[in-house]
Amino acid sequence: MIVGTLKIRLVLRESHSLKDKRRVLKSLKDTLSNKFNISVAETDEQDVWQTAEIGVAAVGSDGSFVQSVLTNVVNYVRFFGGVELVNSEQEIYGD
């Protein structure tokens, strides 16, 4: 079993309240989860309205497949409206 994790730091420049931030992040998280069959959660900066950190987890039997999924997630987030990707950190665990 291979587990891949991804930490993504975002800036939401057009967000003017926590309500705006939550709306954008909910849309992003739902889209990522459905499109890539991954688990997604907001992991830090919950009370700051212009920055966010989301964590992503993917599980599979092939390390290159898991890495490919995480890379595709990063590329998708880069072009998602309303957010700016600041940093991403990817780790792969398992055989």
Feature names for model-found ranges:
Residues 36-43, 84-90:
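Short beta-strand elements
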Residues 6-10, 54-56, 88-90:
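A structural signal for short, well-ordered beta-strand segments
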Residues 3, 41-62, 93-95:
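Short, charge-patterned binding micro-sites
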Residues 1, 33, 49, 78-81, ...:
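A generic structural signal for short, non-catalytic loop/turn and secondary-structure boundary residues
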Residues 59-95:
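C-terminal structural segments of small proteins and small subunits
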